[in-house]
Amino acid sequence: YMSGPYCSMLLADAGAEVIKVERPGSGDPRRSIPPFVQKGDIKKAGGFMAYNSNKKSLSLNIRSNSGQKIFLDLVKIADVVVENLRPGSVNKLGLGYETLKEINPKLIYAAISGFGRLEGYEGPDSQRPAFDIVAEAMSGIMHLVGFEDKPPSWTIYGMADIYSGMCTAYGIMQALFMRERTGKGQFVDSAM
């Protein structure tokens, strides 16, 4: 669940206005994971801050009618939507690419998942959820790190999340450039 935040952080660092939509109450799970950085009375999770610099946050229940209305109002004026939720979850809410492109035909919609899900190119695992460690294990990278006499090892820093986030940000920039030439938005599909 870090590839989307990393991707959008890269866009924010490049000057984009990024609004991160978070679940009401708990927000992003990384908000509560140590280590914490404290300045005066304010205590923040270092990992959350590392992946969310230069962003605005909006607490929004996209499962409610009022939350969906606010979200769709934002989509009308957005250049890009980035999501890295379980495949199909936004479609169940009626907020997938097919719906959003009707509202904003110039929208660049980027979806990051474990195995990719571009229509016509789905593999047998396209609907399966995946975390960074799954992508690292299935790609073989875990076998290349660590020690010869030990079992495969996780790269710790989220290599698959970071790499897929970086590639997605690059894909979004290409899509924005293409939109300047054609006036059309598009779907950017990224697999970890």
Regions found by a protein language model. Give the residues of each.
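N-terminal helix-loop segment corresponding to the beta1-alpha1 unit
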Residues: 1-181, 187
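Mixed-charge, glycine-rich, non-catalytic linkers/tails in nucleic-acid processing enzymes
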Residues: 190-192
